[in-house]
Amino acid sequence: MSITLDKRLDGSVDRVPHVWTAHVHAGATITCPSHLVAKIYDPVFFDDDETRYDDPFYRRDHSISSEVEAYRRLVPLQGTKVPRFYGHFAAMVPDQDSRTVFILLLEEVPGRDLRAIVPPDEAKKVCSKHKEAIVDVALRLFFDVRAYGVDQQDMVSRNIILRPQKHVSASPTQFCDTERCLVALDVDCSDLDMVMVDFEIVDFKEPDPSFSEQAEQRTKIEKIKPTYLRRWLQNGL
């Protein structure tokens, strides 16, 4: 297998992984899409300031093990609420004395992350209708993932992708009554299909199906929703 990197994507708050779209040239014995997302764990590019406090190799190993275990637990949600996971492996970097990096291969989920749709410094321009709908669906996704024992500790808007919406861009439809709402023409509140990505910073718990049961989930959401409405899209949590 060989990989050709294409476009650099936003990464996580951890500085070890570099995230790219990639063309995958697989051998005859490997079955996977030709276009995936590659998360490259390379301690050489770890932030210099952070190496004063953390061993980059420990951070790399911890990040990889967290992601792999998360995707193992989340197999039933792969392809719907989380990306499909196609494995991880070590690879040698050409022209760098065969230096080894570790790579995770993931489905490239179409859509945009919520931070790109609602930049934190413009979150106050989002109307209450849109904010309520976005936060509600994001929290339902959080608890659906938690039901499988994966407690996301990096629950930020950058880690939630909104899939393409059927009626957006097809016509100049305004999806709320607030004329100056930042996403009035860009987000259909009735068609919010979200995917969670990035499981480097998680806590693993016992699976608990009650987190995905509608009544129980609604109770849990109502307890934390006011805080999320005030601060989440502004990266204030």
Residue ranges, per PLM feature:
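ATP-binding glycine-rich loop module of kinase domains
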Residues: M1-R73
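Residues on conserved beta-strands of the protein kinase catalytic domain
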Residues: S34, R99-I103, D193
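Short coil/turn motifs at beta-sheet boundaries
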Residues: V13-R15, T31, D97-R99, V187-C189
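C-lobe/activation-segment region of protein kinase-like
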Residues: K124-A138, D144-L237
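Conserved long hydrophobic alpha-helices within structured protein cores
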Residues: P17-V19, P33-Y41, P76-Y86, V150-I160
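Conserved structural core of kinase catalytic domains
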Residues: D42-D49, Y58-D61, V68, R72-I134
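Amphipathic alpha-helical interaction motifs in eukaryotic regulatory proteins
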Residues: S65-V68, R72-V75, Y86, L139-R146, ...
